[in-house]
Amino acid sequence: MDKAGKSAALENLKGVFEGAGVVVVTHYAGLTVAEMTKLRGLLRKDGAHFKVVKNRLAKIALGGVGGDKAQDLFQGPVAIAYSPDPVAAAKAADEFSRENSKLVIIGAVMGEQVLDAKGVEALAKLPSLDQLRGKIIGVIQAPATKVAGVIQAPASQLARVVSAYASKDAA
């Protein structure tokens, strides 16, 4: 790779590290092209991406974020899974690594924080942003539904009383 190509790749990686909610670092040695394609499809479905990176460029792109721990993640054949959603990439990579032992999760960089493999596994168990939004909307709507029911209850009871008097008078 010539100098211009390296600088373009470096700028691309800087953009990835700045724009990602989480960057999961993996060893991918032994994965076939078909398995890599399947992994990329799984990640893409969740809005995440998978990219093989040069360790030296990744370390420079990190620019000291996460200190030595983050730098230590980039050794050997490394690829990154990243997404704006802090949970999506971790969840998809963890799911794939359970099915295929050739993909080994080393750790992750999440903002200034560096996670180990167990941290990534714990992150993968959290609900995604969309699931959290759904739960929040459900929590917000539940009291509103109850309030509407309480407000309607006296009116419906009054209507039943009037209806009962009307049917009593008719009889």
From Swiss-Prot:
Pfam families documented for this protein: Ribosomal_L10
InterPro entries: Ribosomal_uL10, Ribosomal_uL10-like_sf, Ribosomal_uL10_bac, Ribosomal_uL10_bac_type, Ribosomal_uL10_CS_bac
Keywords: Ribonucleoprotein, Ribosomal protein, RNA-binding, rRNA-binding
Superkingdom to which the source organism belongs: Bacteria
GO BP, sorted A to Z: translation
GO cellular component, one term: large ribosomal subunit
Coiled-coil boundaries: none
GO terms, molecular function: large ribosomal subunit rRNA binding; structural constituent of ribosome
Subunit structure: Part of the ribosomal stalk of the 50S ribosomal subunit. The N-terminus interacts with L11 and the large rRNA to form the base of the stalk. The C-terminus forms an elongated spine to which L12 dimers bind in a sequential fashion forming a multimeric L10(L12)X complex.
Protein family membership: Belongs to the universal ribosomal protein uL10 family.
Function: Forms part of the ribosomal stalk, playing a central role in the interaction of the ribosome with GTP-bound translation factors.
Protein name, per record: Large ribosomal subunit protein uL10
